Amino acid sequence: MPPQGSEARPGHGLHVHHIRPFRDYSYLPGKNEAYRLANEVENLVTLCPSCHRQAEAGQQTRSALGGLAYALSNLAPLYLMCDPADIQSSVDIRNPITRAPTVVIYERIAAGVGFSQRLYELHKELLESALEMVTDCRCHDGCPACVGPPGTIGPDTKESTLSLLKILNERTKE
C-alpha cells in the first residue's frame, strides 16, 4: 500500500475522501449549497483506493463502537440500579492494551463500589439486551433511545451497531 500523499501508480487513479462525510452536510439539490462546504479543501484528502477503503471501514468501526457504547451506557444503570452519572464509557478504535477496537464501560465512583465487576459478570445479558433494544427501536438511522441521535456518532451508526451486536452475541454463546 503506498503511503499517504504518495503519487498514484501509472494507470491507477487516486480517490478523494471526505474527512467529514458528505451526507453530514444535509445537501438538498436545488434548495441549498451545502455541497460547497462538504467539498472545501480542508475537508478533503486524496488517498489510494486501498487507503480509501480502510478510511471508510475505520469510520464504520468508530460508528459501531460509539453506538455500542451509547446503548450499553443507557442499559447498564438499569441492571446496576444506579444513577447514569455513576458510569461512563470509553471508545478506542485501537486500544493500546488490547490492540483492537475496544469499548470500556466503567464506574466513576472513586475507589469503586463494585459496578465494574458486576458489569463484567452481566456482559452477556447486557449485549443481548442491547441487541434487542436496537433491533426493536423503530427509528431508521439511530435515535436517543437506541444508539444516539443520527450523525452525532458517525455514519450508519444503527446499522453498524446492529452488525457488531450480532457478532458479539454470537461469540458470547460459544
Sequence positions of predicted segments:
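Short, cysteine/histidine-rich loop/knuckle motifs that typically chelate Zn2+
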Residues: M1-P3, S50, C143-G148
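Histidine-centered nuclease catalytic patch
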Residues: P2-T46, A55
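Residues immediately flanking
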Residues: I19, S50, R108
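Generic recognition of well-ordered alpha-helical segments
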Residues: N43, L47-S50, S129
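Short, intrinsically disordered, charge-balanced linker/junction segments flanking boundaries
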Residues: C51-A57
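Extended, highly charged accessory segments
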Residues: G58-E174
